[in-house]
UniProtKB/Swiss-Prot annotation:
Protein name (record): 2,3-bisphosphoglycerate-dependent phosphoglycerate mutase
Domain of life: Bacteria
Molecular function GO labels: phosphoglycerate mutase activity
Subunit comment: Homodimer.
Swiss-Prot/TrEMBL catalytic activity: (2R)-2-phosphoglycerate = (2R)-3-phosphoglycerate
Name of the coding gene: gpmA
Amino acid sequence: MKKLVLLRHGESVWNRENRFTGWTDVGLSEKGIEEAISAGRTLKEEGFVFDVAYTSVLKRAIKTLWLVLEEMDLMWIPEYRHWRLNERHYGALQGLNKAETAERHGMEQVMIWRRSYDIPPPPLTPDDQRFPGSDPRYASLLPEELPLTESLKDTVARFLPYWHETIAPAVKEGKRVLVTAHGNSLRALVKYLDLVSDSEIVNLNIPTGIPLVYELTDNMTPIRSYYLGDPDDVARASRMVADQIKK
């Protein structure tokens, strides 16, 4: 049996302010720092050890990974960062308050933008300062790889090549793998692993800072998955994610 641990970064400053974040590189809030440290402590207490870790190129995920590994005394293990693990790009919504956007466009429309599978938010224009083409961390990307907006379907298509080429082979080799990423990049992976339908994915919310453990067969079929946390706390945190468009 193989094990894989997924972790959404701790609460970010923009999570706290209830803004659409996407590829905007914002840091962790004080609560987010505490969540990351707590996740590391829980993983250590439950006997988890990792051989390798993967994360995005956004500092809220990187910092979460560092805090987890520091708490586990595993700062020395190899860690790899890749843009394909980034959060879904929220296009022209990035930086906007979710509840205020729902008031302006209607809760149903914003829910479609946030949680539907194949409908992206309104796109940026290439001259928008939020467009990642001017960011040096993406200088090696092809023009067609730089998003103006993304649906979850787009995020799945972006994420899965790195999963198949890099992360999944490490798990198959027997390495103990930690992936610290984002709500929607992890939703993309969970959708793939659990064969979640396009219509059901709207109901899947991943809370910040709570480790999600997958037990997998040798051919990477899930046996079961579970959060390392009190079920009531996990349910409450998931509801908070779902309710972000409400005041």
